[in-house]
């Protein structure tokens, strides 16, 4: 790397003189050095910061600039000129960029020497900072090759000093070719021919090129070179910095001037416009401002089609004038054509004054100040529905919202559907001035408050809930809808006719009287069929298991005498009225579904006399039972009527049913057997076995007529219908008639009647052999079992639970009644039997067998007439007691109304303290009787002592 010959701090002018001196020192024919120096020094040369500094272009800015600005200016100049670059020549070798272009100097003193001076034309040939060549002012472009040929005009023969010139680093031909290529590459588009290029290359060989010694230095050394004035500020004096104005030819078309695409025609209106003229609305303004000075020439040179674009724009989109109906409110002025000025900005269309602007502004009504609203509290909102202010007294009562849907709306619908009917605004009536609220008297205020609907609740709830008349309207609407008749177009539901059942026949009121007593018309009623046996056969075919017991076959059907003359209605009901409660609870288990007993359930209280076909044969009684007895309510709520039993002959022992062995049965089977007799389920197995043994003995061990049976004496007296007047009842006749009965205690294996058949054999899985059972089967009810049952009962009941004894006469013994039985079948002895009572005592007329809380069984004797009288007195005493004034201590009647549990001992003590004497009953009452009374009235009652023998604390 060679060191530079001159230091960067040396002035460039001195360096030039030294250079020339050294170059011509070896040539004797050269002019003097002073002449050369003086000529060379007179040339104004710009300051250079380095050997490779380019000349400053004339269009360079005099201020500081950035790379972005230089790039923008280069792009702008390239866009203005249409450039066609020639194909570049192939270079043999990539050479480094020449720092200083060679300068051609003619040193001949005799011939005119064209010394190149820094003129603007030469500077154009050089490459500017932006890499773009400059144009000449003459209005055309010249090639760099022509400039080179014009400058080098001195022949080589007239310049002998060039032969003695020191050789340059590069040859002359290479230098000229390289310099020409560099100039051609950096100049603007050149349109020179090949002849010019060859001419330039030929003349370049005769040139004496002068070039400085090439200095190879790094980029860091260039930055350290000092310069007196920055090249950005060095501007030649003869170069004008004023911008050249843009000259637009007059005959250029508009598309070439602006390079714009034709604009899409804009639609003025999407609806049919009014028939107006735009002459006056948009007049041509002579004072319209021009956007730029260049647009005036363009507008004058624009074709007529472009100028009249707005005249025909509306015709393309608007409807024809013939189709548009002229509106009465259209302005009468005719509008002129639109302005003929085409500008970039949108033309502001002037709109003429409308007719509305000519109408004088009406005086706006003066708004009256709204009266101050009093702040309303929640209580005020809640009580606003009850205030009478602002309401018209003579106005019709407002109908409920719900009742309006039930009214016929035919007239209203016809009125609204009429085509001529129009909605009319309701006439506003002036509100009457509210009168001052009249102060009512105390009595009137009380009456008004009594008629007022009170709604209870908090004030916030009352403010949000429905109006107080909502519930009242709801109930009124429900009542009105219920009163409506059925739909006449709906098909009626044909229900099967049902006769009167025991539920309706035995219905009683609050006082115990029969309700809806049916009166039979004996005159117009249809006659009975000629063949009475047909009814019995039909019943036997429907339910053969009920009419004919198992094991009894080849029996002849008896004759049923249905004599209408023996029907009596009034007397049986009169007798029932005498013993209301007794008859109500007499045969609650008579309608059981057991097959070994058949209950009499006639739909009407008629007398049905059973006439046996043969007196010597043992026939079971045929019962006219209701076919639909399965669909009836429980037997405890029904009143049955029982027929008098016919005389029964003795049945041979061969037809006896063996006694079942309850010991081998399971608990489930024992529970079913207990429920079949009408008892509730018993927890202990031994108690169930003992109870079943007693029931079996009471059913199968007793013999005799029905008149001698003490258990059904009351039933036969109250429920057996009488015959015609003057005749005694069949039950009484059967009781008085002498009957044959064996003397002494009857045998266990004997059967009192042929109809005494049980379903035990059908339910037990164990098969029993036919014939007489063994003797050990009759003593299954051991005394230990009876003691267990007696120990679990109250003292009054335990004395009555004993082994049945021999009784000489038991005509006054009451029947056994099972209350609140859950089983389907109850203990329903047939009137044809005369069994002994299950729990009876010969010393007492009526025995209470009601078991309390200590046992799970509920046994009670049918209330007799004496008990019915006692119950009536208890009811009267409880209801007639004065009301209590202490809320903490209500009366007994108030407790019952509030469904409070009644302590039986306390109520019995209260009744015995003089309340029964007050109502006319001379005697005392036991807690067990009070319990029976509570159960008959469905009153919640309990014992003071619990199951474990402890006293209840919270009562």
Swiss-Prot record:
Q: Where is the composition biased (Low complexity)?
A: 189-198, 705-720, 727-737, 828-841
Determine if tRNA-binding is one of this entry's keywords.
no
User: What do the Gene Ontology cellular component annotations say?
Assistant: Slx1-Slx4 complex
Q: Where is this region: Disordered?
A: 75-173, 189-231, 352-376, 539-608, 621-648, 705-784, 819-846
Q: Where is the composition biased (Basic residues)?
A: 123-137, 209-225, 738-748, 767-776
Q: From start to end residue, where is composition biased (Polar residues)?
A: 150-159, 352-362, 579-601
TM segment ranges: none
Where, per UniProt, does this protein localize? Nucleus
The residue ranges flagged as biased composition, category Basic and acidic residues, are 539-551
What GO terms in the biological process aspect are recorded for it? DNA recombination; DNA repair; DNA replication; regulation of DNA-templated transcription
Q: Name one GO molecular function term.
A: 5'-flap endonuclease activity
What does the UniProt keyword field contain? DNA damage, DNA recombination, DNA repair, Nucleus, Phosphoprotein
Query: Does Phosphoprotein count among this protein's keywords?
Result: yes
Q: Which family does it belong to?
A: Belongs to the SLX4 family.
Q: How does it assemble?
A: Forms a heterodimer with SLX1.
The protein in question is named Structure-specific endonuclease subunit SLX4
Annotated source species? Pyricularia oryzae (strain 70-15 / ATCC MYA-4617 / FGSC 8958) (Rice blast fungus)
**Gene name of this polypeptide:** SLX4
């Amino acid at each position: 790397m060679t060191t530079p010959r001159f230091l960067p701090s040396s002035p460039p002018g001195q360096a030039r003189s030294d250079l020339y001196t050294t170059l011509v020192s070896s040539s004797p024919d050269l002019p003097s050095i002073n002449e050369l120096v003086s000529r060379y020094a007179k040339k104004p040369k710009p300051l250079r910061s380095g050997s490779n500094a380019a000349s400053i272009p004339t269009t360079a800015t005099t201020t500081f600039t950035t790379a972005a600005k230089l790039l923008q200016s280069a792009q702008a100049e390239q866009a203005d000129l249409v450039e066609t670059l020639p194909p570049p020549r192939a270079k043999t070798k990539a050479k480094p960029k020449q720092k200083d272009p060679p300068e051609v100097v003619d040193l001949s003193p005799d011939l005119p020497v064209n010394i190149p001076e820094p003129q603007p034309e030469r500077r154009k040939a050089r490459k500017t900072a932006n890499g773009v060549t400059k144009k000449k002012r003459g209005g055309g472009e010249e090639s760099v090759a022509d400039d080179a040929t014009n400058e080098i005009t001195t022949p080589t023969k007239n310049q002998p000093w060039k032969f003695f010139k020191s050789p340059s680093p590069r040859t002359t031909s290479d230098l000229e070719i390289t310099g020409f290529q560099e100039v051609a590459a950096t100049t603007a588009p050149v349109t020179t021919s090949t002849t010019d290029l060859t001419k330039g290359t030929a003349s370049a060989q005769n040139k004496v090129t002068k070039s400085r010694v090439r200095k190879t230095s790094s980029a860091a050394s260039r930055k350290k070179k000092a310069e007196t004035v920055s090249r950005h500020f060095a501007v030649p004096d003869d170069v004008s910095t004023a911008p050249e104005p843009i000259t637009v030819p007059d005959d250029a078309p508009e598309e070439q001037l602006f390079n714009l695409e034709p604009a899409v025609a804009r639609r003025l209106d999407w609806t049919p416009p009014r028939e107006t003229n735009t002459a006056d609305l948009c007049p041509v303004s002579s004072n319209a401002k021009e956007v730029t000075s260049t647009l005036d020439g363009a507008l004058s040179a624009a074709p007529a089609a472009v100028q009249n674009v707005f005249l025909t724009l509306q015709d393309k989109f608007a409807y024809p004038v013939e189709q548009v109906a002229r509106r009465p409110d259209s302005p009468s002025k005719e509008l002129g054509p639109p302005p003929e000025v085409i500008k970039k900005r949108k033309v502001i269309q002037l709109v003429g004054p409308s007719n509305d602007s000519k109408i004088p502004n009406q005086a706006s009504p003066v708004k009256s100040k709204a009266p101050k609203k009093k702040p309303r509290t929640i209580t005020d909102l809640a009580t606003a529905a009850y205030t009478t202010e602002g309401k018209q007294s003579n106005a019709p009562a407002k109908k409920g919202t719900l009742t309006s849907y039930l009214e016929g709306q035919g007239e209203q619908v016809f009125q609204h559907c009429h085509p001529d009917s129009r909605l009319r605004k309701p006439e506003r009536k002036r509100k009457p001035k509210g009168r001052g609220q009249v102060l009512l008297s105390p009595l009137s205020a009380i009456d008004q408050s009594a008629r007022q609907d009170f709604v209870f609740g908090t004030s916030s709830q009352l403010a949000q809930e429905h109006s107080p008349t909502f519930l009242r309207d709801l109930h009124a609407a429900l009542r009105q809808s219920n009163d409506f008749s059925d739909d006449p177009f709906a098909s009626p539901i044909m229900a099967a006719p049902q006769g009167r059942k025991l539920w309706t026949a035995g219905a009683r009121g609050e006082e115990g009287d029969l309700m809806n007593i049916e009166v039979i018309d004996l005159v117009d009623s249809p006659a009975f069929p000629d063949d009475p046996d047909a009814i019995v056969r039909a019943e036997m075919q429907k339910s053969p298991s009920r009419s004919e017991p198992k094991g009894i076959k080849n029996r002849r059907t008896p004759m049923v005498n249905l004599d209408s003359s023996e029907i009596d209605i009034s007397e049986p009901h009169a007798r029932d009225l005498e013993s209301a409660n007794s008859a109500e609870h007499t045969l609650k288990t008579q309608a059981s579904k057991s097959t070994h007993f058949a209950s009499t359930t006639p739909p009407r209280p008629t007398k049905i006399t059973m006439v046996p076909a043969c007196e010597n044969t043992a026939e079971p009684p045929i019962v006219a039972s209701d076919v639909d007895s399965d669909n009836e309510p429980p037997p405890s709520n029904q009143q049955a009527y029982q027929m008098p039993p016919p005389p029964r002959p003795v049945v041979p022992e061969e037809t006896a049913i063996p006694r079942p062995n309850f010991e081998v049965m399971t608990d489930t089977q024992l529970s079913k057997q207990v429920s079949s007799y009408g008892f509730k389920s018993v927890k202990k197995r031994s108690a169930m076995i003992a109870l079943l043994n007693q029931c079996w003995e009471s059913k199968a061990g007793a013999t005799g007529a029905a008149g001698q049976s003490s258990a059904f004496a009351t039933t036969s007296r109250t429920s057996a219908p009488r015959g015609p007047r003057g005749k005694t009842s069949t039950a009484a006749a059967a009781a008085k008639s002498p009957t044959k009965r064996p003397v002494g205690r009857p045998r266990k294996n004997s059967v009192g009647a042929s109809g005494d058949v049980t379903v035990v054999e059908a339910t037990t899985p164990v098969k029993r052999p036919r014939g007489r059972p063994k003797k050990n089967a009759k003593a299954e009810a051991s005394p230990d079992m009876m003691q267990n049952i007696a120990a679990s009962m109250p003292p009054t009941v335990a004395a009555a639970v004993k082994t049945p004894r021999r009784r000489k006469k038991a005509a006054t013994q009451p029947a056994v009644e099972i209350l609140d039985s859950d089983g389907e079948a109850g203990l329903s002895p047939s009137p044809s039997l005369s069994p002994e009572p299950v729990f009876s005592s010969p010393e007492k007329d009526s025995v209470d067998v009601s078991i309390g809380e200590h046992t799970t069984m509920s046994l009670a004797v049918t209330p007799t007439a004496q008990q019915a009288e006692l119950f009536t007195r208890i009811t009267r005493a409880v209801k007639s007691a004065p009301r209590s004034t202490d809320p903490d201590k209500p009366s007994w009647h108030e407790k019952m109304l509030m469904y409070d549990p009644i302590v039986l001992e306390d109520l019995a003590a209260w009744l015995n303290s003089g309340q029964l004497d007050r109502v006319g009953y001379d005697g005392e009452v036991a807690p067990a009787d009070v319990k029976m009374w509570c159960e008959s009235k469905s009153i919640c009652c309990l014992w003071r002592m619990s199951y474990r023998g402890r006293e209840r604390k919270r009562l």
